[in-house]
């Protein structure tokens, strides 16, 4: 083509432009130049949606995601998104979380009822996925919720606590524009309407956000971030006593009182009863504080211990999240970070959260094995110099905040395991907490339960949690028991406590010294 003709169809350059300014006025120039200008005008003529998109960009607003555009178009056309048909039965109206809570046998029976084929060999997650696709193809949109995990690429997925926050086929995709618009972070509990995956998609997609952390989505933007909240000393006591025959919680309430926002270590040798102690404390919190949210986080644990914990502690206000010893270290790290981030979002909303972590020693081992935390500098026992930074950050998240809400973490630390690394990990955490419950090997050998060393266990600033008269009587009791060995002290204490129905009655029998 001749250079002069090429110049005629070359679009003008602008540093700041509007699509409308690119339209050329009609010209009476005859010949090829006129045809070229007409062609150029056709090329630059915007379609009917271009002006709208430019106005959005000029206003510096995030563009709508594809799912949100679908909702917008349906609403503009006079339809309503996510409304089931009138003849839809209540059973068909189950949301994604209702299906995730069903047992495998119940899912199979439901799939057979709805006519699904070749389902006998499907794993549980795939069965839920097939059921959801079948229902959504018949009834349209459904409702879903989960805990958000934001990936490095900017998008995220809603994970389910039923699957211990593992990646599953029925996870719900959340677009980057939705994350930016509502200021979402990892750990946010998001609920809304979802749509099924298209032909070239693998996951369900979130269409419209209806709730964030069980509140209005716009309320999230008015909340202060967790790191900007003001930490305080624990002042509100957690009473775990709930059964007169459950002596472990009664002993803890007297000698190591726990407050909302406590950061405590349960120092335990092998087979000292730390798991049973955590179960008793968790049951006490759930029984006495129905508004508190309890999470039992089991890291590098045996599968049978996980099953036992799930059956012993059952409550709508409790989660048992685990990553067993056959999982890779990266999985331990991911589940721990998800649990702590979710707890932070709940604290921002004013909720009291209590996490029982078993164990922080194994979590530190996982970070030590993670290549992202490695610095190449080894300490005693083979511990990397940078491996403790993130576990300390997780443990240090526990606090009572002035704006309302609290995060309490009670973590077990393993000692006397024969591993030098475990001893170094315990020394790193020693002094970072404000509560220690020390379990004694001699008490375990004598079969004395609870195996708590009363002289080495205690709470910092316990006078802020106890009544003045109660504190005086406990101090007198401590002095009396300190004159004996740990075995004799606990044996005598158990004998006296079994004669009373509760701690208040027991303390009345203690005469304080002036």
From Swiss-Prot:
Domain of life, per UniProt, equals Bacteria
- GO terms for MF: ATP binding; ATP hydrolysis activity; ATP-dependent activity, acting on RNA; helicase activity; RNA binding
Task: Enumerate the PROSITE patterns for this protein.
Answer: RHO_RNA_BD (PS51856)
Q: Basic residues bias located where?
A: 35-45
Q: Which residues form the Rho RNA-BD domain?
A: 141-216
User: What's the short name of a Pfam family annotated to this entry?
Assistant: Rho_RNA_bind
Question: EC number(s) of the enzyme?
Answer: 3.6.4.-
State the UniProt keywords alphabetically.
ATP-binding, Helicase, Hydrolase, Nucleotide-binding, RNA-binding, Transcription, Transcription regulation, Transcription termination
Q: Where does ATP bind?
A: 259-264, 271-276, 302
- What are the GO BP annotations of this UniProt entry? DNA-templated transcription termination
Q: Where is this region: Disordered?
A: 25-52
Q: What does this protein do?
A: Facilitates transcription termination by a mechanism that involves Rho binding to the nascent RNA, activation of Rho's RNA-dependent ATPase activity, and release of the mRNA from the DNA template.
Summary of subunit composition and partner proteins: Homohexamer. The homohexamer assembles into an open ring structure.
HAMAP family xrefs: Rho
Family membership, please give it: Belongs to the Rho family.
Q: What is this protein called?
A: Transcription termination factor Rho
């Amino acid at each position: 083509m001749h250079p002069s003709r090429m110049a005629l169809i070359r679009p003008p350059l602008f540093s700041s432009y509007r699509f409308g300014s690119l339209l050329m006025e009609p010209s009476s120039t005859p010949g090829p130049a006129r045809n070229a200008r007409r062609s150029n005008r056709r090329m630059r003529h915007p379609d009917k949606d271009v002006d709208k998109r430019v106005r959005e960009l000029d206003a510096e607003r995030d563009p709508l995601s594809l799912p949100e555009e679908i909702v917008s178009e349906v609403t503009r056309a006079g339809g309503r998104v996510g409304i089931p048909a009138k003849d839809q039965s209540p059973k068909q109206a189950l949301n994604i979380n209702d299906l995730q809570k069903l047992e495998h046998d119940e899912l199979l029976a439901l799939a057979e009822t709805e006519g699904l084929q070749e389902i006998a060999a499907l794993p549980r997650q795939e069965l839920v996925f097939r059921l959801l696709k079948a229902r959504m193809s018949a009834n349209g949109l459904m409702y879903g919720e989960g805990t958000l995990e934001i990936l490095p690429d900017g998008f995220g997925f809603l994970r389910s606590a039923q699957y211990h926050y593992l990646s599953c086929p029925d996870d719900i995709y959340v677009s980057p524009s939705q994350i930016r618009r509502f200021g979402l972070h990892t750990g946010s509990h998001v609920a809304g309407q979802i749509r099924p995956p298209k032909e070239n998609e693998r996951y369900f997609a979130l269409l419209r956000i209806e709730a964030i952390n069980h509140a209005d989505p716009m309320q999230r933007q008015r909340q202060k971030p967790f790191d900007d909240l003001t930490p305080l000393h624990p002042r509100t006591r957690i009473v775990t006593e709930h059964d007169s025959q459950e002596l472990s919680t009664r002993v803890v309430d007297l000698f190591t009182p726990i407050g909302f926002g406590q950061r405590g270590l349960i120092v335990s040798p092998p087979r000292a009863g730390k798991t049973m102690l955590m179960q008793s404390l968790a049951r006490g919190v759930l029984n006495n504080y129905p508004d508190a949210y309890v999470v039992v986080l089991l890291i590098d644990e045996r599968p049978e211990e996980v099953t036992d914990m799930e059956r012993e502690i059952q409550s709508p206000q409790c989660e048992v999240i685990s990553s067993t010893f056959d999982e890779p270290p990266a999985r331990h790290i991911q589940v721990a970070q998800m649990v702590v981030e979710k707890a932070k979002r709940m604290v921002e909303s004013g909720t009291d959260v209590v996490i029982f972590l078993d164990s922080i020693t194994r979590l530190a081992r996982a970070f030590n094995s993670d290549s992202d935390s490695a610095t190449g500098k080894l300490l005693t026992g083979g511990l990397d110099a940078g491996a403790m930074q993130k576990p300390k950050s997780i443990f240090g998240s526990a606090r009572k905040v002035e704006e309302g809400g609290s995060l309490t973490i009670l973590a077990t630390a393993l000692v006397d395991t024969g591993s030098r690394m475990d001893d170094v990990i315990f020394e790193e955490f020693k002094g970072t907490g404000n509560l220690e419950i020390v379990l004694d090997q001699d008490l375990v050998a004598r079969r004395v339960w609870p195996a708590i060393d009363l002289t080495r266990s205690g709470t910092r600033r316990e006078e802020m949690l106890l009544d003045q008269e109660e504190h005086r009587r406990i101090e007198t009791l401590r002095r009396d028991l300190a004159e004996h060995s740990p075995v004799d002290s606990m044996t005598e204490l158990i004998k006296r406590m079994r004669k009373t129905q509760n701690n208040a009655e027991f303390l009345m029998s203690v005469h304080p010294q002036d």
